[in-house]
Structures are given as C-alpha cells and as structure tokens.
A protein has these predicted regions:
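Alpha/beta-hydrolase fold nucleophile elbow
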Residues: 188-199
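Glycine-rich nucleophile elbow surrounding the catalytic serine of serine-hydrolase chemistry
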Residues: 197-210
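Short alpha-helix in the alpha/beta-hydrolase fold that links the catalytic acid
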Residues: 437, 451-461
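N-terminal cap/lid subdomain of alpha/beta-hydrolase-fold enzymes
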Residues: 25-26, 65-166
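Bacterial N-terminal signal peptides
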Residues: 7-21
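A catalytic-pocket lid/entrance helix-loop region that shapes and gates access to the active site
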Residues: 111-116, 212-309
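Catalytic histidine-centered segment of alpha/beta-hydrolase-like enzymes
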Residues: 478-489
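Alpha/beta-hydrolase fold catalytic core
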Residues: 291-443, 448-449
Length: 509
C-alpha cells in the first residue's frame, strides 16, 4: 500500500510539471557521455607537438537504445593538423582480459610516460617521475586509449551486468560499437585507421578488425604487441605438446640473458636460429614418439635441451622432456633461491617457498604495478582534470575469472566450436577481404606469456597468398612482454611504428 501511494504521489508531481520540464526531468535521469578537455605538449624527434587531450565517456546502448555501459577513454589529437579529419587515428588497448589501457598510455605510446628502470629492477617507492614521452606516436597518429567494460572507469549501466561484456564475442561487439560511435561522433570516418592491441588485446584485435570491416569500416593497419591468437600454442595441457616446442626458444633466450649457459653464446639471434631448428625438427619428433622413443634418443635430446636452457640433463629426463613455463621460471635460478617473471623473465626476485615448482606471485607485476597505479591516478586527476567517484580499476580480476571463451569463427553459420579458442581465421579473413590491410607484429625475446616463436607459428598459420604475405611486418626486441619497459626497445618500437604507419597510409592507390 505504501509503495502504491508513493507511485501515485510521483505521478501527481509529474502531471503538475510543464511538458518541457517533464522531458528535462526524464533526460536528466538518463546517463550521458561526459568529457574534460585539456591541452599539452610533447617533444618527439626534437619537435614540440601541441595536442588536445579529451578524457571522457561514451554511452553504449542496446538495440532498444537503452543505455547498457559507460566506456571511458582518453584521446590525444595533434593540434594544427592540416585537414584534421584525414589525419591517422589509432585505437589502443591492453589485454587481460580485465586490464585497463594504463600500460600502453602511461608506459608506451601516450604523450606522458612513467619512468621505470630499463634494467628490470624493481621500481622504488613514490614519488614517481611522469615525464615527456619522446616515443609517443602522436608525431604520426592521433590515439584513443580505450578501457573495456569492467576496467578503468568503464562499467555496466542499469540492469546490464558484466556477463553481457565479458567474453570473446561480447567484448568484440562492445569495443566495436564504441569505435563506431567514436568515429561518428568526432567525424573520423575518412581518417586512416589503425587498431593497436597488446597481449589479450592482440586476440581481441584479430576478431575486432574482422567485425569492424564487416560493418563497412575499413582499416589501414593492425598493430600487435606480444601476441596470442591461438591458445593451443600457449596452453600447457595434457595431450598438447605444441607449447613445449614453441616455448623452447624463449627458454634459451632467457637462459642466455641470465648467463646460465656454458659456453655463453655471443650472438643471441644466431643462437636462437639453432634452437628454433632443433625445436622444429629433433625436439618435436621426439615428443611425437612418446613411449616409443628409445632411451638412447631420449638421452641425446635431453643433453641438447640442457645445453640450450641451462637446466640439467637429469632434470629434463625427470620431466619426460616436457618443462612448462612455471617449472622453468622456478628452476632456472633455483640455486640462488630466485624465480623469474612470466611476462618478462628479465625480472627476478626471491622465491617465497623455494621448494615449489610454480611462482607464488607475479614477479614483474610486483616490480612495476605500484608505479603505474600511482601514476595513472595522479595523472588523470591532476593533468587531465578528470575526477570520478569510482575507483580506477587498473586490473579487474573478476573479468578474467568470469570470461566466456567461446568464439564463433567466421564462415560458420552455427555457434562456437569446442577446443582451443583461435582467432587466426578472423585475421586471415580480414586481410583477404581488405587486401590493402597491413599487419605489424612485435614480440619480445624474454616473454613467457606470449613467446615470440609461438607468435611466428600462429602468423605462419594465416596461410596468406604470397602477395599478402608482403603486408606482414615482424619485429623482435630484447625485452619481455611489455616492450616499452626497456628504453632502447621502446625507441626501436617507436621507429618501427613510425615506418609502419607511413607504409600503411601511403600505399599505391
């Protein structure tokens, strides 16, 4: 009875309002996009670039135009560009799933950069140095950093829940709709366009480029940093020997970095070519033989594995010639009581329990997360003047824990298929249907999250026609997963990005 009286009271109030006041009242109750504009400068190649930064949100709506999510972004546009509507624009995001775009924005390609040691040492406590980033891509492209729903300040609205966004295809749809809305709102349809994803962001990108091109939005280039496109190549599961083969060159590179090899190879690239050849031919053949592998053959393979990784021959035999990433990280420097990082094995720290064969904590994250968390919270409030009552979620573990890994591949009229999730067919379709699309692939030698040789394997699985294979540009760096954590690698990445954007924009027409 009380609820009915309240409802009647509200109806009477609304009836008493003039029509325009009633409309305004309804509109004010609906979520709306908001943004804050600031201005800054960045010096790149000795040239001062003036830019406009816009930190804000766009509202995603369902088919009934009901608001379902508020998506936060930070966009940087170069000021004074001739024919600004035709200037290149790059949409950038990190991975997870469940990560905000803080890493790329504050560490890699944004105009400001939080300074961390290049030598993989733990970052000291605050205050942190947030400086001019001479390796930003603003010299070549405007850039929009996007926080997927559930990360950063982005969140579901109304009755919508994370389940509607936290999945391979759900994520592609929401990110795709954001990009379409952004391009329409800010009149960038005629701009050369790029997608740039890191880690799981590369997986997202391979499906997203196909989704957007199916909506009629053509792209000039796709940029992948630390790629995972087919989880069969990186999932250590019973019956799947592929990761053992594809991770081996990274084990060798990491052992080389930590001087765990005897003799110590002088040239890493030449050394890795030998390891790759061994992995493809001798090692893979040995694993395929299973129990039929002779003891003599097993000894020969174990000896070679020991030579290439620094782990003892007896350790490899005990492991049945199969050492997963967790085991390698804890075994390599175990005599010193140290473990290496997963995403960047240059990072080392003490093992909490040296008897365990798996990491108890993320070594790289423990070294850098504090700096990035503090820096982005300070930067958003003090430099961009964006204030929110919500916490900025650098990483949201709930997203990854509740992620729907099913994916409907292109050219299939029915739903997702069982097995390892794979978006290689999506990227292949995007490159074939848009034969001008350029692909840039970047990988770090010391990355055990997305190993460089696994990346090469999946890119080769695109099976592109010979002419389109010329559109694939692959680069390797002497660093781990986050290529920008080492300044020389970041400088090389910047050089390669500049060249790639030029190639992609200035194609023959």
């Amino acid at each position: 009875m009380y609820i009915k009286r309240c409802a009647l009271f509200l109806l009477l109030i609304m009836a008493a309002l003039p029509t325009h006041d009633l409309y305004a009242a309804i509109q004010s109750s609906r979520p709306s996009a908001n943004s804050v504009i600031t201005h800054g400068t960045v010096v790149i190649h000795g040239v001062t670039i003036h830019y406009t930064a816009r930190a804000g949100t766009l509202i995603l709506r369902n088919a009934l135009q009901v608001p379902i999510a508020s998506v936060f972004y930070v966009a940087y546009w170069k000021d004074g560009a001739r024919n600004a509507a035709n200037r290149p624009i790059t949409f950038a995001y990190n991975g997870g799933p469940g990560s905000s775009s803080v890493w790329l924005q504050m560490g890699g390609i944004g105009p400001r950069r939080v300074m961390v040691p290049s030598d993989a040492k733990s970052v000291p406590p605050p205050p942190y140095d947030i400086s001019n980033n001479p390796y930003s891509i603003l010299d070549k492209s405007d850039v929009v950093f996007i926080d997927p729903v559930g990360t950063g300040y982005s969140h579901p609205l109304g009755k919508a829940t994370g389940k509607q966004f936290w999945g391979v295809d759900q994520d592609v749809h929401s990110m795709g709709e954001f990009i379409i809305d952004y391009v329409s709102k800010f009149d960038r349809w005629n701009s050369p366009k790029f997608l740039l994803g890191e880690s799981y962001g590369t997986f997202r990108t391979a499906a997203l480029i196909n989704y957007l091109q199916n909506q009629g939005m053509q792209f000039n280039g796709v940029i992948l940093l630390s790629s995972v496109l087919n989880f069969e190549a990186s999932s250590f599961q019973p019956g799947n020997d592929l990761p053992y083969i594809l991770f081996l060159p990274s084990y060798a590179a990491i052992a080389w970095y930590h001087h765990a090899l005897s003799p110590d190879p002088k040239n890493l690239a030449a050394f890795l070519k030998r390891v790759e050849k061994f992995a493809i031919y001798d090692y893979s053949t040995a694993l395929l033989q299973g129990d039929s592998l002779s003891i003599n053959q097993e000894d020969k393979i174990a000896a070679k594995l020991s030579e290439y990784t620094g782990l003892s021959q007896s350790y490899w035999r005990k492991a049945d010639l199969r050492v997963n990433a967790d085991e390698f990280e804890t075994a390599l420097l175990s005599r010193q009581g140290l473990v290496t990082g997963r995403l960047d094995a240059r990072y080392v720290n003490y093992a909490v329990n040296p008897l365990l064969s798996f990491r108890e904590y993320p070594v790289m994250a423990s070294a850098i997360d504090g700096a990035f968390t503090s820096a982005v919270n300070y930067y958003l409030r003090n430099d961009l003047h964006y204030i929110s009552s919500r916490p900025y979620l650098i990483i949201n573990g709930d997203v990854g824990r509740h992620w729907d890994w099913k994916h409907k591949p292109p050219f299939r009229s029915f739903g997702a298929r069982p097995g390892f999730t794979d978006v290689v067919p999506d990227l292949r379709r995007a490159m074939i249907t848009n034969p001008h699309l350029q692909l840039m692939v970047n990988a770090g030698y010391f990355d055990l999250g997305t190993p460089y040789f696994a990346t090469q394997y999946t890119i080769n699985e695109l099976k592109l026609p010979a002419q389109l294979q010329k559109h694939v540009h692959m680069y390797h760096y002497y660093v781990g997963h986050m290529l920008y954590l080492n300044t020389p690698s970041l400088a090389a990445l910047h050089h390669n990005l500049d060249r790639f954007i030029d190639i992609s924009v200035r194609q023959k027409r």
